[in-house]
Amino acid sequence: MSDGTSKSGSKSSFHFVAGLGSGVLSAALLQPIDLLKTRVQQSPHQNILRTVSEIRHTSPAGLRGLWRGTVPSALRTGFGSALYFSTLNAIRQAAVPLFAHDAAVTTSPNGGNFANNKNNSSRLVKLSNTGNLLAGGVARGFAGFVLMPLTVIKVRYESSLYSYRSIAGAAGDILRTEGPRGFFAGFGATALRDAPYAGLYVLLYEQFKRRLGGVVSSSAAPETNEDNRMGVSRAAAVNFSSGVLAAVACSVVSNPFDAVKTRIQLRPGRYRNMVVAARTMMAEEGARSFFSGLGLRMSRKALSSALAWTLYEELIMRAEVGWSLSSSRTERAM
């Protein structure tokens, strides 16, 4: 294998590792919010306070029961983030000739381009709005399909409708009662929720970064690093704020699909598919049921997305600096 190919492979692998680390951390920290969302969505009569009270009084672990399902959630979110970020990076690199952003860019050691100015808080590839929308949607759809079995197990394990004692027990019961198809229950609703969400998220995230970066740079004292980019602390603040704003906007748009998906995964016998689930929910509970758990989901999405993207961007930024220094030393030695 050539040295160039080896370096390219290691850099692609680093996007996977960076995504894995950021995903596991955010999942572990925010599992209580995810569990509460699942419990609230499983019944029209549930609310946050009642759910917390039930967990506190009925769970053998007390309030530690809020972390029930952390392992499948961390596995799903961790490997989902790893697969998503590495796939997204590959798609964005390949899409540069078709959807390159029209701003002045500099070639990065990772093979793409990034804006090289004091308003920029990122070293990720810069694409047009259309490019970001398509890249985010395709990457999320692919990652969602691969990780769907873990998603189903996670939702069932978190729900109070099932008394699974272990992840293996949950997987065995699903396989025994529903067959392999049971591991993909709700994939249609999940894909319709996640692919547009991810595409719109990447688009808005990049837009917010560009606009907030300009505001921060123009309203504060200069803080740039050696390559004239925004300083680390301000870059992290811009990235985190952009992640929160993008997640809030996307959560509102995609929540109906999330509510439908949860019903299908929890009660596949009653809610056989998206159409049946949507009709039943509308007839029995009204339009409000499609926004059940919105506050919890919005909170979790805002925090998890912002944490994951900020940590991912920071890891990639540090890696890019290391690769640049390594390349410079190699060139001087030749």
Swiss-Prot record:
Localization in the cell = Mitochondrion inner membrane
Keyword set, alphabetical order: Membrane, Mitochondrion, Mitochondrion inner membrane, Repeat, Transmembrane, Transmembrane helix, Transport
Ranges for the Solcar repeats: 10-94, 127-211, 234-318
Instruction: Give GO terms: molecular function aspect only.
Output: glycine transmembrane transporter activity
Segments spanning the bilayer are: 16-41, 69-95, 133-158, 186-209, 238-264, 293-311
Name one process (GO BP) from the record: heme biosynthetic process
Q: Tell me its family.
A: Belongs to the mitochondrial carrier (TC 2.A.29) family. SLC25A38 subfamily.
Q: What is this protein called?
A: Mitochondrial glycine transporter
